[in-house]
Amino acid sequence: MLKGIHPALSPELLKTLAEMGHGDEIVLADTHFPAHSLHKNVIRADGISIDILLEAITPLFEFDAYVDAPLLMMKAVEGDSLDPNVETRYLNAIESAVGFTPNLTCLERFDFYTRAKQAYAVVVSGEIAKYGNIIIKKGVTPIL
């Protein structure tokens, strides 16, 4: 255990966040996401909701300032419903952790899958919300 590190962050996830460079993306996926068929670098965070993971990750993570939206979510498939509280919950978690909310855009389901394949890693969470997946694009970490 380390002081100042959120207990939701496993050693494997901390290592992954540290390895990522600017422009790299990480997927925080719900329990329904086909992580293992889309990606080789899959990290388990069973039982931990994505809003908790966002509260844990975002204080350690610089968002990419050179893109319009460093946050990406999946749109509901036509004819399906999406709980608007999911996006609100995620943005509130980020706001609570870092004091602001970066821009967010939504991708069609298969565009999201294509983007997820290119990510640095996929974190499978305990999130049960339908379409509860989010991609975060890492920015340049300022040197203090």
Swiss-Prot record:
Q: Which InterPro entries match?
A: L-fucose_mutarotase, RbsD-like_sf, RbsD/FucU_mutarotase, RbsD_FucU
GO terms under cellular component: cytoplasm
The record's keywords, sorted A to Z, are: Carbohydrate metabolism, Cytoplasm, Fucose metabolism, Isomerase
What's a Gene Ontology MF term here?
A: L-fucose mutarotase activity
Membrane-crossing ranges are none
Question: Which top EC class is named for this enzyme in its record?
Answer: isomerase
Q: Where does substrate bind?
A: D30, R109, Y131, G132, N133
- Its main subcellular localisation, reduced to a broad class, is cytoplasm
Enumerate the subcellular locations listed in this protein's record, separating them with semicolons.
Cytoplasm
Keyword Nucleotide-binding attributed: no
In the Enzyme Commission scheme, what number(s) does this protein have? 5.1.3.29
Which NCBIfam families does this one have? PRK15420.1
Q: How does this chain assemble?
A: Homodecamer.
Family label: Belongs to the RbsD / FucU family. FucU mutarotase subfamily.
Protein's recorded name: L-fucose mutarotase
Q: Which gene encodes it?
A: fucU
